[in-house]
């Protein structure tokens, strides 16, 4: 038994020795670095990405990463162990989204007074730079250039962003295919023309009767306003060729014929923005400047030269056409209300040539003065001019007046000043604003007063009683100027005005006999001269909308 136990113990020890036998592993010596010299077969052709366990992985994989990274930030988030291979998987710290709040992204329009704030900042930078060394001055100068460049760019963007959308205006008359363009005259060239030395016009014939001006209206002010009344009188707007006096004078006097309104439109054309047209007939060596009947030529524009002229639709209360009808209605009623209607009129030698026996109603107070001007080189101009009233001067002399009315429709929409707040204290600011918004209309009124030889040009300030009602108005104040002084104040150069007229006359005189048309381009600063067929506009009355004609007629007969 003892032998058997010894034998079993030997066998167990042998088994234990076999189980605990140490097998020496294959050790590869890599003198050039760490790791095996050869890759096992199972690990061949597997892409290897070096990494470090301490690196913070931002993504599992990036299929949209760029092939080339920005060298400026190559060591910002990459591990020193991983090298450039971790660039695609580099962890980047994002802002904590728990502090995220929705904010109002609406752009706030900067007021105009903030435009110069960059200039003030530049001045402070310039002051600091002057106290430092040369390098600081160079840095400040560079910053000044950057701020100046940014300021210009921001001003340009501000201007484009805040400009009103440009609305294409319609032409006063449709250009037909059979019209031939003879000349295009742009405003910059016309502004350089001059005809100095034109003397005061000579009276050829005076006719009509006018009433005396009521000086009590000079005391009207904002606190003592007067309502504008409706005066039912007849106004005649006769064109040149329909004037019996001009027809008679054309046989013996002059070779160019027109009315003061037509001449003022041509002479002040460089200030106009809206489209207008004038018909010219050349018969032999004579020119007749005409307007088309029952058109908007005689309507007064409103805010034509404003930065943002009225652009409402045709049915709107403040559309350009409705505002023009309102302004014409105001002018006619104001020019008759401020007169002494109960006193005898001042009469010229000849009666009003346009009164017919068929007309019913009272004719408006108006006197016509037919005058003659010598424009040199054989050009003699005959024009019909108008006076609205007379009054006694300081020395009891008779002074002739041209009476016009400026109207306020909506100061907020017109980018203007509120008359009821400014007229009594800052009348000059109100007039300056009107000169900006209605430069063409005021210039034409001044030219008409100068052509007629009026002694005074009287303005009335008429405003709506309610902003939303264009039928009721009140007179807030009156003001008068001498035409020559007012022309200087509004920078009206009569030598240039005569030069423009003479240029157009010379071009037309060189054409063959026929009918021509001058039209202001509705969207460009230029006028064009067309050669049109002789029968043009003869059947126009049947083609045009009768409703529009009735509106224009009603504006002159109310």
Swiss-Prot record:
Stored PANTHER family: EUKARYOTIC TRANSLATION INITIATION FACTOR 3 SUBUNIT 7 (PTHR12399), EUKARYOTIC TRANSLATION INITIATION FACTOR 3 SUBUNIT D (PTHR12399:SF0)
Domain of life: Eukaryota
GO molecular function: mRNA cap binding; translation initiation factor activity
Description of how the protein assembles with itself and partners: Component of the eukaryotic translation initiation factor 3 (eIF-3) complex.
Cellular component, GO, one term: eukaryotic 48S preinitiation complex
Pfam family, one: eIF-3_zeta
Family statement drawn from the similarity comment of this UniProt entry: Belongs to the eIF-3 subunit D family.
Subcellular location field: Cytoplasm
GO BP: any one term: formation of cytoplasmic translation initiation complex
Name listed for the protein in its UniProt record: Eukaryotic translation initiation factor 3 subunit D
Keywords per UniProt: Cytoplasm, Initiation factor, Protein biosynthesis, RNA-binding
Lineage: Eukaryota, Metazoa, Ecdysozoa, Arthropoda, Hexapoda
Database matches in InterPro entries: eIF3d
């Amino acid at each position: 038994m003892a032998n058997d136990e010894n034998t079993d113990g030997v066998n167990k020890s042998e088994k234990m020795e076999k189980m605990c036998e140490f097998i020496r592993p294959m050790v590869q010596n890599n003198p050039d670095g760490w790791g095996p010299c050869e890759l096992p077969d199972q690990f061949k052709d597997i892409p290897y990405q070096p990494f470090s366990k301490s690196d913070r992985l931002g993504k599992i994989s990036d299929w949209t990463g760029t092939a080339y990274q920005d060298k400026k930030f190559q060591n910002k988030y990459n591990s020193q162990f991983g090298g450039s291979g971790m660039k695609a998987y580099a962890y980047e710290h994002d802002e904590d989204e728990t502090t995220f709040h929705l904010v109002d992204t609406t752009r706030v329009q900067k007021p105009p007074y903030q435009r110069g704030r960059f200039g003030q900042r530049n001045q402070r930078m310039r002051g600091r730079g002057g106290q430092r060394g040369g390098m600081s001055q160079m840095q400040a100068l560079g910053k000044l250039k950057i701020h100046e460049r940014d300021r210009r760019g921001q001003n340009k963007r501000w201007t484009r962003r805040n400009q009103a959308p440009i609305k294409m205006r319609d032409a006063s008359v449709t250009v037909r295919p059979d019209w031939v363009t003879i000349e295009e005259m742009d405003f910059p060239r016309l502004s350089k023309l001059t005809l100095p030395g034109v003397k005061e016009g000579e009276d050829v014939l005076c006719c009509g009767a006018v009433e005396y001006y009521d000086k009590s209206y000079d005391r009207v002010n904002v606190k003592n306003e007067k309502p504008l009344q409706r005066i039912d009188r007849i106004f005649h707007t006769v064109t040149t060729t329909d004037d019996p006096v001009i027809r008679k004078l054309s046989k013996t006097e002059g070779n160019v014929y027109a009315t003061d309104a037509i001449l003022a439109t041509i002479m002040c054309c460089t200030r106009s923005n809206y489209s207008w047209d004038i018909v010219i007939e050349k018969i032999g060596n004579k020119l007749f400047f005409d307007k088309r009947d029952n058109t908007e030529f005689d309507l007064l524009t409103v805010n034509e030269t404003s930065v943002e002229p009225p652009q409402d639709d045709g049915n709107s209360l403040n559309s350009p056409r409705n505002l023009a009808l309102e302004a014409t209605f105001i002018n006619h009623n104001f020019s008759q209300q401020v007169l002494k209607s109960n006193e005898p009129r001042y009469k010229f030698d000849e009666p009003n040539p346009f009164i017919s026996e068929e007309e019913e109603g009272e004719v408006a107070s108006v006197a016509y003065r037919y005058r003659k001007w010598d424009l040199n080189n054989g050009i003699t101009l005959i024009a019909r001019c108008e006076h609205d009233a007379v009054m006694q001067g300081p020395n009891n002399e008779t002074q002739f007046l041209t009476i016009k009315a400026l109207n306020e429709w909506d100061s907020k929409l017109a980018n203007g000043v509120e008359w009821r707040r400014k007229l009594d204290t800052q009348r000059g600011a109100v007039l300056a604003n009107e000169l900006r918004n209605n430069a063409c209309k005021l210039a034409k009124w001044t030219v008409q007063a100068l052509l007629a030889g009026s002694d005074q040009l009287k303005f009335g300030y008429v405003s709506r009683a309610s902003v939303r009602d264009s039928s009721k108005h009140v007179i807030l104040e009156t003001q008068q100027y001498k035409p020559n002084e007012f022309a200087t104040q509004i920078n009206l150069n009569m030598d240039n005005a005569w030069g423009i007229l003479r240029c157009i006359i010379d071009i037309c005189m060189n054409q063959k006999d026929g009918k021509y048309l001058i039209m202001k381009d509705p969207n460009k600063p230029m006028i064009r001269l067309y050669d049109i067929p002789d029968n043009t506009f003869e059947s126009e009355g049947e083609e045009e909308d009768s409703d529009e004609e009735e509106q224009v007629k009603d504006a002159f007969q109310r």
